Amino acid sequence: MLARTVTTLSALSGGRVVLGMGAGGLPDRIADMGGSRFTPAEAVEAFEEVILLVKSLAGRGEPVTHEGRHYRVRDIEPAPVAAPPVWTGSVGRKSLAATGRVADGWLPGHAADWLSERYRTSRPVVDGAAAAAGRDPREVRTILNFPGRITDAPLAKTRDEKGRWIGGSVDQWVEELTSGVLEHGMSGFILFPPGHAAHDDVSFGRWAREIVPAVREIVAKEG
């Protein structure tokens, strides 16, 4: 059902769907909703298995029979369209390795970016697993959750005491994001409000109209 749902949504949206997958950080809630209760190791196994299964059930081809440790299907015809990209928010080494082997994108989580210890210690695990599986590590894109304010005037400091991005003027945003792409290999950014603030339509509008086009233009010229 998951494979059918996401491939249908991808087709209807013109390819604007991304499937986010995780190993399950809330086992009690998953069990309450009828899901299997896995140990942490089993959850990572199931996570990797289901990503492979979703991909195999898309893009046409012969009927799929799968007898895995956690999932089984018999003679299911793949959807006639490709599966959407699968992104994960893996944290532990085993799930990071699974991301490298089978996923298409990785979000470090906790607003981590290329300056963070989380990124510096985790991305090599993804890359090593991808290479060991015969993949080009660059196939696994890094996409960042980027919180922060968009201010009218430049800020004296654009990062907090822990080195996390907190925002700045449009020019400061453009400089930071462009550096992330051109110098550190980032593939995309997701803007969200800092802290627990509500979504701000004005900020999202400025992001879409002023920041994103400027970053794309610079990357296209220099990339």
Protein language model features and the residues they cover:
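Active-site-adjacent structural elements that line small-molecule/cofactor binding pockets in enzymes
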Residues: 1-223
